[in-house]
From Swiss-Prot:
Family: Belongs to the universal ribosomal protein uL23 family.
Subunit record text: Part of the 50S ribosomal subunit. Contacts protein L29, and trigger factor when it is bound to the ribosome.
Listed InterPro entries: Nucleotide-bd_a/b_plait_sf, Ribosomal_uL23-like, Ribosomal_uL23/eL15/eS24_sf, Ribosomal_uL23_CS
Pfam families given in the database record: Ribosomal_L23
Function per UniProt: One of the early assembly proteins it binds 23S rRNA. One of the proteins that surrounds the polypeptide exit tunnel on the outside of the ribosome. Forms the main docking site for trigger factor binding to the ribosome.
Segments passing through the bilayer: none
HAMAP family, sorted: Ribosomal_uL23_B
GO terms of molecular function: rRNA binding; structural constituent of ribosome
GO cellular component: ribonucleoprotein complex; ribosome
Gene Ontology process terms (BP): translation
Keyword annotations of the record: Ribonucleoprotein, Ribosomal protein, RNA-binding, rRNA-binding
Name of the protein: Large ribosomal subunit protein uL23
Length: 99
């Protein structure tokens, strides 16, 4: 796997919710779902290279899978990893494409 593939596999997708929308407006923090094996340094370099922005800090947390029932069978949803990426002042990521 070359470095470009690793960058694309590190950041899975942006995590969009009311809380993350408020964070992005208030203090330019973007939330991503990232690979389970990703470290803070991996996420920082991937975001800086993919979106051409300057990252100030990265906080990562593991989200446990929730217990669910599938008919009579008890199971769990998949666990995943979330990264809070704080961008440097003057930098922004525009996912919609509108100016």
């Amino acid at each position: 796997m070359n470095s470009q593939e690793k960058l694309l596999k590190t950041v899975v997708r942006p995590h969009v919710s009311d809380k993350t929308y408020g964070l992005s407006d208030a203090n330019s923090t973007i939330v991503f779902e990232v690979a389970r094996t990703a470290t803070k340094q991996d996420v920082k370099s991937a975001v800086e290279k993919l979106f051409e922005v300057k990252v100030e800090s990265v906080n990562i947390l593991n989200v446990k899978g929730k217990a669910r029932r599938f008919g009579r069978v008890e199971g769990r949803t998949k666990a995943w990893k979330k990264a809070y990426v704080k961008l440097a002042e003057g930098h922004d990521i525009n996912f919609v494409g509108a100016e």
